[in-house]
Amino acid sequence: MLTQTLADRSAEMAPHFQPAFLQRQQASFQFLFDSGEPFHLEVEGTSFEFSPGEARQPTITLYIKDHATCWNLLDGSMDGMNAFMDGSYRADGNIVLSQLILYLFRRAEPAFSYEIQD
């Protein structure tokens, strides 16, 4: 079941993937949950893959309340600072990556353009 969920989420998130936010070619993100099976994200260049289980050598380990919180953080519908402050999100490892991952799959905000006329 987790394997299918990860495949479905990958397909949903692929159009929004922005690897330039990481400022590195490779990263391994381990997601551990208070409730729910662990999984990890491997980023290699311009590709990514979510896999069930634990990574061999994660670049960073993210401790998250549950799967729903994780997906909400990744798609930008939940603020990372709020999740951190309420104890739903913390990290061990390369802490800079704990912030950059929050923008890795974020959907672009609509842009507004204004024209000023005299």
Give the ranges of each region predicted by the language model:
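Feature captures hydrophobic
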Residues: M1-D118
